[in-house]
Amino acid sequence: MVQIKSPEQIAKMREAGLVVAAIHAATREAAVPGATTKDLDRVARKVLAEHNAKPNFLGYGGFPATICTSVNEVVVHGIPSDDVVLKDGDVISIDCGAIIDGWHGDAAYTAFVGSGHASELVELSRVTEESMWAGIAAMRQGNRLVDISRAVETYIRRQPKPGGGRYGIIEDYGGHGIGTEMHMDPHLLNYVDRRRGKGPKLVPGFCLAIEPMVSLGTPKTQVLEDDWTVVTTDGTWSSHWEHSVALTPEGPLVLTAPDGGRAKLAEYGITAAPDPLA
């Protein structure tokens, strides 16, 4: 069953989403050469405390940290550690969430540590982020879940990969419903699987975390011995972007974007829903 939210509940999720946005801003500034991924976790904990918010990652299924810090070939669920020191040229994806009065926010971004990154890495992150926005733009009343998957996949497949070949759209992980829990039905693939059908129709009150994960090579992954860290099987580097989005009668509201998604959705000719906290 898909949890449909009231306008008041979406407003609470917007509060949680803005805390996530604040964590993103603080960790992005702190992700510099010489910092450890545990340093970034400490930054996130400080932001949560300042906003009287709870972490939704810490303790989830036994996860031992507040945020996920996934460096280079790590796709998702990297565990912050004092032993992982960021270096010039690294790429890091930071995934984090927050809870306000029982309502969840969840989002991720990819950042470049230092300078001197290969153009293929810059393009990988751009393609992944833009495919997320294509998916968000497809979150409109009357569409079905598969329309979001199709929008994400179509955008990625239309982008030429530097050096040839195709980007790997990660198969084993995807987006999800969000609300009173961080992960809820429905599961959202980042590609079209016709065996799954079209999925539910999108109606006001529908809330999703849309999160493409893309690699420079394989779509296949494996989990390391810590039972959390997910890496590409061929060692190619990856990118991960995510926003939590609510569908309202006035259109989509990107709960974890500071401006509610207004600027990016305008590029698609879409007006973002009014911010309930404005």
Set out the residue ranges of the language-model regions.
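Active-site neighborhoods and metal-handling regions in enzymes and metal-associated proteins
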Residues: M1-A278
